[in-house]
Amino acid sequence: MDNGIFIVATIFVVNILYVTIYTVRLLLTMKGYRYLAALSSVFEMIIYVVALSLVLDNLNNIANVLAYAVGFGVGIIVGMKIEERIALGYITVNVITKEYNLDLPNQIRDLGYGVTSWLASGRDGERMMLEILTQRKNERKLYKQIIEIDNGAFIVSSEPKQIHGGFWIKQVRK
């Protein structure tokens, strides 16, 4: 293999590794996994120095710079895909039903979720408001289950910053 092609390929692959680790490390930091984030940053910096030195030592070849830039973009995509798979943390899902249905909270509880419900008033009458805490990795599954039960439900999710007490207390502790 030609040395120039080998350097371009190496820069590309090493930068994908660097940015993937960077993306995951950033998400670990935001989720509060400080020691795991610190450990990953060590590997991130080693890989970064290798990739950057390869580019800086070979700046006369535009393909090296392009490999670095494209590897950066691909690394972000790969890092985000990994984060979606591990889906760290929890989400709070708020549901406003189309109609007031006393059985709905129990149907969702039967699926294994903790549910708090209360009467709400909408423009067109009484609604039920539900608040559900679940792991992020279950978010899509929960959305599908809610829509199967109430196709007209309004669903909004957000990430809680702190959790204390309630249905999940034993499972949420880090």
From Swiss-Prot:
Write out the transmembrane intervals.
Answer: 4-24, 36-56, 62-82
For this UniProt record, the keywords arranged alphabetically read as follows: Cell membrane, Membrane, Transmembrane, Transmembrane helix
Q: What domain of life does the native source organism fall in? A: Bacteria
One Gene Ontology cellular component annotation held by this UniProt entry: plasma membrane
Signal sequence coordinates:
none
Family recorded in the similarity comment: Belongs to the UPF0316 family.
What protein name does the entry list?
Answer: UPF0316 protein lin1888
Organism listed in the record: Listeria innocua serovar 6a (strain ATCC BAA-680 / CLIP 11262)
Q: What is the lineage of its organism?
A: Bacteria, Bacillati, Bacillota, Bacilli, Bacillales
